[in-house]
């Protein structure tokens, strides 16, 4: 479908605005995936706070220029589906990783997080980042465990001291 200049400018403006507020970006090749499957992916993306769009590579190069996602420029070949994580940095990576397991033709190209390019082979690094709630839960469990351990050591020291004075 031919796009006129105004349409191209509108696409660049829209995606640029989204990119400014995004925490991470993931690019993928969705050739061979059925429309039904893509619709499911888009629905899951909306629920996870992920903005997804198929954008021409020339327009996408303009979008990422001067942003933290500029490192993705070299991966922009062939049909490109870009996903921006808006709420959690690992949301798009997690979504694409799970979708790729179920759909062999779906190929994750790369991801970008804080200006760093993450290859498709290392996408697990980003996909396994804990959410805010998970991180707080882990911290609280660690703190609780440390406090319990300190109490046990203190009680053992008191016991040892009493045994030493009794003997």
Swiss-Prot record:
Keywords tagged on the record: Ribonucleoprotein, Ribosomal protein, RNA-binding, rRNA-binding
Record-level GO BP terms: translation
Top-level lineage group: Bacteria
HAMAP family reported in the protein's UniProt record: Ribosomal_uL10
Assembly and interaction partners: Part of the ribosomal stalk of the 50S ribosomal subunit. The N-terminus interacts with L11 and the large rRNA to form the base of the stalk. The C-terminus forms an elongated spine to which L12 dimers bind in a sequential fashion forming a multimeric L10(L12)X complex.
Family statement drawn from the similarity comment of this UniProt entry: Belongs to the universal ribosomal protein uL10 family.
Name of the molecule in the record: Large ribosomal subunit protein uL10
Originating organism: Erwinia tasmaniensis (strain DSM 17950 / CFBP 7177 / CIP 109463 / NCPPB 4357 / Et1/99)
């Amino acid at each position: 479908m031919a796009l006129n200049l105004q349409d191209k400018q509108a696409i660049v403006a829209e995606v640029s605005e989204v990119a400014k507020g995004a925490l991470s970006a993931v690019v993928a090749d969705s050739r061979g995936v059925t429309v039904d499957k893509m619709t499911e992916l888009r629905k899951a993306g909306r629920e996870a706070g992920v903005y997804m769009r198929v954008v021409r590579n020339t327009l996408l190069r303009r979008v990422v220029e001067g942003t933290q996602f500029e490192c993705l420029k070299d991966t922009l070949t062939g049909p490109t589906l870009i996903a921006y994580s808006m709420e959690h940095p690992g949301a798009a990576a997690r979504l694409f990783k799970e979708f790729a397991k179920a759909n062999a033709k779906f190929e994750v190209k790369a991801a970008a997080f804080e200006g760093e390019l993450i290859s498709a082979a290392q996408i697990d690094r980003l996909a396994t980042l804990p959410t805010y709630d998970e991180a707080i839960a882990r911290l609280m469990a660690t703190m609780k465990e440390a406090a319990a351990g300190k109490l046990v050591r203190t009680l053992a020291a008191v016991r040892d001291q009493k045994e030493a004075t009794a003997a």
